[in-house]
Amino acid sequence: MIKGAVFDMDGLMFDTERLVYENWQSMMDEYGYPYDIEFFKQTVGKRKKEVHLMYLSRFGDDFPYWQYADEGKARYVEHIKREGIPVKKGLYDILEYFKGSGVKIALATSTSRQTSELNLKIAKVSDYFDALVCGEDVKNGKPHPEVFLTAAERLGLDPRDCAAFEDSINGIKSAYAAGMTTVMVPDFLQPTDEIKPMITHLCRDLNEAIDQIRNS
């Protein structure tokens, strides 16, 4: 049995990638920039500094990325405070399962601590987590393993005794490089041929992930 469970957040715990995409699509339509979901998919799992460069490359050096990112975040916060946060199937079950089994739980996300803590609070899952590792806590974003190695360290565990739960390609690369058991629950992105050998368990949802971990 694993001793630690390390969760990505957006797209894995919460159906927030779609909210972010819808905000960007709405803003880009309003401001007259051609935009589509395929470009957005390329940004999934990357840190904002990387995404910033992608937008400049696509839309020009004068593209006001940070202005739009701030506006998008404000729209996002307003939405989840008003409507709540969309929780992925099986999230409460898997957190309860690990907590009841004595497994330590950490968050490993490229999202800011402020937004991460707000998401956890609104979903009422903050108390399940023994450690949070957020975007500003590491120098290197996924696919570098730093975020997962830091999560294991904060849990006081060897990474090899932990399972990482991810929905993104970069996330799986990061967790695999950290030496963790990897569990992929795809959201926007399906596993590529490159990362399939890196995936220990490929699951439809977090309920199936419980079964896979329990039976492994």
Segments predicted by a language model, with ranges:
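Helix-loop "lid/cap" segments that line or gate small-molecule binding pockets
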Residues: 27-28, 47-61, 119, 151-152
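Short beta->alpha linker loops
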Residues: 19, 46-47, 86-90, 111, ...
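Residue-level detector of anion-binding/catalytic polar loops
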Residues: 34, 104, 181
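Metal-dependent phosphoesterase signature
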Residues: 55-93, 101-103
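Short, surface-exposed acidic
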Residues: 33-41, 60-69, 159
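Active-site neighborhood of HAD-like aspartate-dependent phosphohydrolases
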Residues: 1-42
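Conserved SAM-binding loop
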Residues: 13, 87, 105-108, 140, ...
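Asp-based, Mg2+/Mn2+-dependent phosphohydrolase catalytic module
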Residues: 1-3, 96-99, 112-216
